């Protein structure tokens, strides 16, 4: 029997899983239908499609990891299961973070203005640059996950120690120790895409500040299309970076949870908050993206008409 706290954890993580799968699945479906109709896919749709696929994978791995680690910690002490979960989580996690950084870079290149030669070249070649970045993101994520799998598969010391322990909690604490160095290192390295996102955000803010300063000289009265585009992009990136930061911090909490006395509570809290990022941000993308929002409105309108008739 599960405790009341376990039942609350199951309800919350199940709700986040459903929201995340439906939200990200909807984005992918809309982009896929648009791709079929137009026989081509835009750069932003390409980024979003790759992003939501990585998030669906990440949410699935995180839910499985959370349920096993919180509700069945004795099962998690098995070496092969830990290696499989950690490898897939690392791959999906890095894909998600780098695709998110790629989305921020796209917003920055598309909307911001700068006279720097490198920026102008990247802006002209934005479609080619983004596709190479996406390919690079996949290569980096695959390489890191393979390194994690190799490192963990060669470290079986915890199994020999854990099998002499009778207490499940002690087994869990012992089993996490060999994973501390590689997983913590790669969790800390994941700050690189976050820094890339921050740089893109500040470049966009700087561009808006300079653009607003120039507009004041002409006193046109009202915001021009460029200003509106800057504001929309900054709103989107602000929410994205907030969720990104929250996810990164809670991922570290999960990685260091074995150091906390009540590790089970820390792990459950970390998993629930971390899943908010890939699940909740999909809803924000739907609201802020004109095409996705209009498609959802049309779908709801058609459903309402069908119900009436």
UniProtKB/Swiss-Prot annotation:
Cytoplasmic compartment spans: 29-50, 104-131, 206-239, 288-309
A Gene Ontology cellular-component term: plasma membrane
Keyword Membrane attributed: yes
Extracellular side: 1-7, 72-82, 153-184, 261-266
Main subcellular location of this protein, as a coarse class: membrane
Keywords for this protein: G-protein coupled receptor, Glycoprotein, Membrane, Receptor, Sensory transduction, Taste, Transducer, Transmembrane, Transmembrane helix
TM ranges: 8-28, 51-71, 83-103, 132-152, 185-205, 240-260, 267-287
Membrane topology: Multi-pass membrane protein
Subcellular location per the Swiss-Prot or TrEMBL entry: Membrane
Family annotation (InterPro entries): TAS2R (IPR007960)
Glycosylation sites: 167
MF terms (GO), sorted A to Z: bitter taste receptor activity; G protein-coupled receptor activity
Lineage: superkingdom: Eukaryota
Gene3D superfamilies (UniProt xref): Rhodopsin 7-helix transmembrane proteins
Function: Receptor that may play a role in the perception of bitterness and is gustducin-linked. May play a role in sensing the chemical composition of the gastrointestinal content. The activity of this receptor may stimulate alpha gustducin, mediate PLC-beta-2 activation and lead to the gating of TRPM5.
Family stated for the protein in its record: Belongs to the G-protein coupled receptor T2R family.
Note: Most taste cells may be activated by a limited number of bitter compounds; individual taste cells can discriminate among bitter stimuli.
Protein name stated in the entry: Taste receptor type 2 member 8
Organism: Papio hamadryas
């Amino acid at each position: 029997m599960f405790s009341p706290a376990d039942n609350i954890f199951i309800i919350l993580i199940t709700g986040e899983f459903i929201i995340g799968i439906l939200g990200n699945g909807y984005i992918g479906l809309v982009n896929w239908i648009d791709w079929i109709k137009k026989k081509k896919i835009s750069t932003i749709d390409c980024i979003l499609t790759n992003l939501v696929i990585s998030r669906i994978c990440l949410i699935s791995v995180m839910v499985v990891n959370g349920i096993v680690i919180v509700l069945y910690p004795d099962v998690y002490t098995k070496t092969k299961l830990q290696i499989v979960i950690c490898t897939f989580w690392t791959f999906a996690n890095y894909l998600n973070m780098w695709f998110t950084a790629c989305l921020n870079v796209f917003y920055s290149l598309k909307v911001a203005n700068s006279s720097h030669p490198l920026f102008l070249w990247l802006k002209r070649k934005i479609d080619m640059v983004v596709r190479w970045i996406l390919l690079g993101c996949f290569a980096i994520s695959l390489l890191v996950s393979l390194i994690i799998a190799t490192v963990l598969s060669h470290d079986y010391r915890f199994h020999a120690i854990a099998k002499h322990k009778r207490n499940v909690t002690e087994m869990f604490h012992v089993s996490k120790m060999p994973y501390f160095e590689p997983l913590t290192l790669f969790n800390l390295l994941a700050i690189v895409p976050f820094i890339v996102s921050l740089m893109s955000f500040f470049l966009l803010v700087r561009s808006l500040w300079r653009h607003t300063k120039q507009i004041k000289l002409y006193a046109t009265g009202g915001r021009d299309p460029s200003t509106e585009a800057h504001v929309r992009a900054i709103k989107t990136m602000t929410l994205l970076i907030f969720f990104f930061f929250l996810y990164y911090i809670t991922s570290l909490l999960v990685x260091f949870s074995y150091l906390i006395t009540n590790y089970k509570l820390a792990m459950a809290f970390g998993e629930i908050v971390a899943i908010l990022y890939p699940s909740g941000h999909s809803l924000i993308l739907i609201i802020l993206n004109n095409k996705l929002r209009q498609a959802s409105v049309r779908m709801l309108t058609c459903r309402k008409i069908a119900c009436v008739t």
